[in-house]
């Protein structure tokens, strides 16, 4: 047999003890013994008289001796078990998509999946009683966005009547509800459904999901106490998009005596509100209260100025340092709106809102703000002129706001660069620290007593209320178990730190994609454009799976490893790896940057535009269910398109104006 003779694929049935291949008038009998529960291997026949497994990447070399040579007629044996598909190439197979979370990622998914895919079964689960994600669950006093309101919008939505430059949290929550109603998404959303367990079923290529939900109320008076316990349900999915984000898990700070306090103790992430969802009623009787606020991050810098005029006395306990920035893009906003300077509270007037009702003016306003915001990337790179300039500006700004108590600057103003931590506008925070009824306390807390806070120097503050504004669990240790191939858990895979393929997916966890997962956030700027692009990327993957009858898709280990190496090298050039405590580094001063995307906003948009399909491993569905004989071209179907087979629709659609790409003629 010539040495360059082609390999001939041969498949062997589990229930067969031999496979006969006829070639060059000779017959080859291959004796094989395969256990009934074993996976059916697919082999290639080589010219050296051996069979080798076709499946690459498992690192296993195997061969079976042949009793004779081969010839081209063995192709017939290779196709044993293949059955031509009966569907047209453009008939999409039924496809089940489950989205976890009804925040902005889930809302975008609800809009785009149904817009861009056909024949799908979509369900969006959320543990909360309403939509909005972090904007539903976070309701603390003063909650607001930290980027301009008109930049924190979906690209295809135009809200012109925001009340303030930094949109209040309740307004954002109402906006998410409006979008859900506009696009009729509640038919896909199931509230009060909390994911507790997800496991990938390898034979079927589906995720098996367990969720906890309230048990349906009983109509009988004799219902037992167990009837009020939550019930567990199961669902399955061909494709999962987890949009849980990093601001959905919180815990109490590790301070001695926290449970001993006899007064009221609150966490910013679990603030009690009335039915309207606004926080004002919860602090209505605090006028005679002594309140302690623990923290100086973005949450604390919103709570302190909000509570200061509403309480008798306020103590702000601060452990670390942080930069407080001027109004982000405030000068740009003022210039477009025609103001001489940014107003103190940055609220929009009726005149402003009337201007913004004009579609062309609104487009100019929003485009100007976002262009300016996207020009700030060099602030995050060490040693750049823009980085040095911003540090000087922030220092001048903070000192100008602390003239009454200038000593605070020594404890609050950092030595690290302005973007080592996420930029904190904190409008009104520095001014609140100057108030006579506020004590800035830059000392460590020793413990909480029954009546207040004891510091390490022995000082004790009597308090009526303690507010813990101590952030979130940003370790990506999700509150539900995710089990991939071979019983591997996502928690184990993310130890000692999360590793992903471009922040979206992980090897060993097929058909599981993430929005706002590890390394997907920015140090400054709006996250919504990222969420949109992550969802759109996930849809491209899901469409490919549906169209090409792919059972599973997952990134190659080498691709995950290479992205991890890129992360390591990129962040060495940035301010993010300086010595500062940040949630980017899971609350540590030094260590791995797990929260941020390695690049700019525009960089991530470009990254997600065109998937690199060569970075993925695939498994295909069997052409005959249960045969164990997948064929990558089964999706070609019966050789027809739907319209020509049924003699319906446009049979020359490629000539439509929206399909023809007319090239320009060179001059």
Predicted regions mapped to residue ranges:
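Rossmann-like dinucleotide-binding core of oxidoreductases
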Residues: 77, 87-94, 98-99, 104-121, ...
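Beta1-alpha1 glycine-rich phosphate/pyrophosphate-binding loop at the start
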Residues: 58-73, 95, 99-100, 104-189, ...
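Extreme N-terminal leader/targeting segments of oxidoreductases
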Residues: 2-97, 115-119, 218, 233, ...
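Feature captures the FAD/FMN-dependent oxidoreductase FAD-binding
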Residues: 163-248
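A conserved short coil-to-beta-strand element within the FAD-binding core of flavoproteins
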Residues: 191-207, 438-456
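Central helical "cap/lid" subdomain
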Residues: 255-265, 451-503
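C-terminal, flexible cofactor-proximal segment of oxidoreductases
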Residues: 64, 323-326, 354-360, 499-500, ...
């Amino acid at each position: 047999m010539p040495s360059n003779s082609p390999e001939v694929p041969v498949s062997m049935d589990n229930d067969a003890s031999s496979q006969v291949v006829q070639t060059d008038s000779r017959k080859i009998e291959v004796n094989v013994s395969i256990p009934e529960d074993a996976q059916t291997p697919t082999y290639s026949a080589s010219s050296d008289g051996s069979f080798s497994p076709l499946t690459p990447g498992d690192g296993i070399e195997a061969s079976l001796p042949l009793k004779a040579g081969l010839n081209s007629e063995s192709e017939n044996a290779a196709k044993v078990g293949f059955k031509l598909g009966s569907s047209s190439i453009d008939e999409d197979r039924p496809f089940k998509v489950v989205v976890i979370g009804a925040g902005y990622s889930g809302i975008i998914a609800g809009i785009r999946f149904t817009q861009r895919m056909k024949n799908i079964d979509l369900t969006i689960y959320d543990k909360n009683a309403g939509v909005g994600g972090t904007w539903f669950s976070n309701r603390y006093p003063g909650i607001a966005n930290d980027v301009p309101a008109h930049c924190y919008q979906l690209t295809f939505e135009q809200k012109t009547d925001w009340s303030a430059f930094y949109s209040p949290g309740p307004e954002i929550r109402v906006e998410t509800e409006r979008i859900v109603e506009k696009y009729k998404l509640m038919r896909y959303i199931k509230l009060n459904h909390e994911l507790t367990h997800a496991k990938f079923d390898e034979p079927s290529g589906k995720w098996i999901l367990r969720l906890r939900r309230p048990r349906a109320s009983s109509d009988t008076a004799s219902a037992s106490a167990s009837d009020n316990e939550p019930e567990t349900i199961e669902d399955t999915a061909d494709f999962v998009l987890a949009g849980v984000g990093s601001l959905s898990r919180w815990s109490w700070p590790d301070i001695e005596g926290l449970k001993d306090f006899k007064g009221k103790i609150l966490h910013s992430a679990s603030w009690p509100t009335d039915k309207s969802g606004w926080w004002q009623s919860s602090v209505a009787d605090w006028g005679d209260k002594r309140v302690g606020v623990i923290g100086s991050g973005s949450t604390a810098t919103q709570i302190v100025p909000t509570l200061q005029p509403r309480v008798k006395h306020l103590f702000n306990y601060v452990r670390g340092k942080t930069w407080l920035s001027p109004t982000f893009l405030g000068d740009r906003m003022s210039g477009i709106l025609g103001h001489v300077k940014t107003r103190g509270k940055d609220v929009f007037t009726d005149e402003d809102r009337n201007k913004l009702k004009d579609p062309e003016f609104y487009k100019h306003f929003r485009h100007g703000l976002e262009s300016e915001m996207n020009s700030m990337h060099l602030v995050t790179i060490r040693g750049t002129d823009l980085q040095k300039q911003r540090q000087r500006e922030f220092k001048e700004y903070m000192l100008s706001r602390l003239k009454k108590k200038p000593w605070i600057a020594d404890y609050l103003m950092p030595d690290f660069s302005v973007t080592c931590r996420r930029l904190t506008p904190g409008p009104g925070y520095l001014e609140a620290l100057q108030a006579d009824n506020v004590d800035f306390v830059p000392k460590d807390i020793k413990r909480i007593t029954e009546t207040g806070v004891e510091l390490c120097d022995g000082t004790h503050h009597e308090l009526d209320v303690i507010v813990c504004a101590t952030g979130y669990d940003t370790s990506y240790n999700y509150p539900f178990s995710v089990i991939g191939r071979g019983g591997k858990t996502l928690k184990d895979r993310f130890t000692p730190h999360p590793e992903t393929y471009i922040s979206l997916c992980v090897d060993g966890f097929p058909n599981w994609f993430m929005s706002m997962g590890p390394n997907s956030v920015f140090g400054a700027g709006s996250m919504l454009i990222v969420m949109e692009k992550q969802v759109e990327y996930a849809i491209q993957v899901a469409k490919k799976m549906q169209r090409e009858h792919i059972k599973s898709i997952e990134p190659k280990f080498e691709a995950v490893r290479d992205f991890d190496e890129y992360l390591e090298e990129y962040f060495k050039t940035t301010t993010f790896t300086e010595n500062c405590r940040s949630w980017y580094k899971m609350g540590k001063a030094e260590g791995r940057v797990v929260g941020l995307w390695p690049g700019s906003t525009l960089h991530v948009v470009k990254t997600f535009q065109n998937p690199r399909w060569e970075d993925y491993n695939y498994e295909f569905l069997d052409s005959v269910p249960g045969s164990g004989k997948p064929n990558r071209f089964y999706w070609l179907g019966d050789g027809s398109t739907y319209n020509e087979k049924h003699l319906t629709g446009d049979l020359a659609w490629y000539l439509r104006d929206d399909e023809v790409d007319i090239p320009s003629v060179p001059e």
